[in-house]
């Protein structure tokens, strides 16, 4: 499901917020993967803009590298002077618009806490750096193995001492 969730979404809260119905706002989504539209509920209309020409111009001049988001006019918390800001005050209570960024492999690595393995200072890059000597390439792996072996050794010592201690004498019960 990676890369399938990105876009501008209209959310309607139901049953006091217990349920939420969401649909994709096609014209506010500037990077749209048309191959995944079958997996997404597309809104039949925009809740704030009725004019189709105005809707079609929302993403006009969009530049992904500069804007660093896949949506326009979809974030009520953005700077009001930015292209991402939307005023949701005309919407009914329990209704909102939000931008959901696509989920990619980098996000998955970060969520799993494996980001220390990547990057210039990451374990994988250090072990595959072509300008390093063989020892420098193997050093991170040796350190990790050393730590694992140390933990196993300490566990062995603790368990061995516990097994060598005699059991405590039975308690005398006065009846």
Swiss-Prot record:
Q: Where in the cell is it found?
A: Virion membrane
Question: Topology versus the membrane, per the UniProt entry?
Answer: Multi-pass membrane protein
Q: What domain of life is recorded for the organism? A: Viruses
The record lists the membrane-crossing segments as 139-159
- Major place of residence: virion
GO CC, sorted alphabetically, is:
membrane; viral envelope; virion membrane
Q: Which residues are glycosylated?
A: 125
Provide the alphabetized UniProt keywords: Glycoprotein, Late protein, Membrane, Transmembrane, Transmembrane helix, Viral envelope protein, Virion
**Is Hydrolase one of the keywords UniProt gives this record?**
no
Q: Which InterPro entries match?
A: Baculo_ODV-E56
Query: What's this protein's function?
Result: Structural protein that is specific for occlusion-derived virus (ODV) envelopes but not of budded virus (BV).
User: Anything else the record notes?
Assistant: Expressed late in infection.
**Into which family does the record put it?**
Belongs to the baculoviridae E56 family.
Please identify the protein, giving its name as recorded: Occlusion-derived virus envelope protein E56
Species of origin reads Heliothis zea nuclear polyhedrosis virus (HzSNPV)
């Amino acid at each position: 499901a990676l890369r399938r969730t990105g876009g501008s979404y209209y959310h309607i809260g139901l049953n006091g917020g217990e349920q939420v119905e969401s649909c994709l706002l096609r014209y506010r989504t500037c990077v749209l993967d048309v191959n995944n539209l079958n997996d997404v509920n597309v809104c039949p209309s925009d809740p704030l803009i009725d004019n189709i020409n105005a809707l079609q111009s929302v993403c006009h001049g969009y530049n992904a590298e500069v804007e660093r988001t896949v949506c326009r006019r979809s974030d009520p918390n953005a700077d009001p002077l930015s292209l991402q800001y939307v005023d949701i005050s005309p919407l009914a209570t329990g209704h909102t618009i939000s931008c959901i960024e696509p989920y990619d492999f980098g996000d998955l690595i970060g969520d799993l806490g494996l980001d220390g393995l990547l990057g210039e200072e990451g374990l994988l890059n250090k072990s595959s750096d072509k300008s390093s000597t063989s020892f420098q390439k193997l050093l991170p792996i040796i350190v990790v193995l050393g730590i694992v072996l140390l933990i196993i050794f300490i566990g062995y010592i603790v368990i061995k001492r516990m097994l060598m201690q005699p059991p405590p004498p039975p308690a005398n019960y006065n009846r």
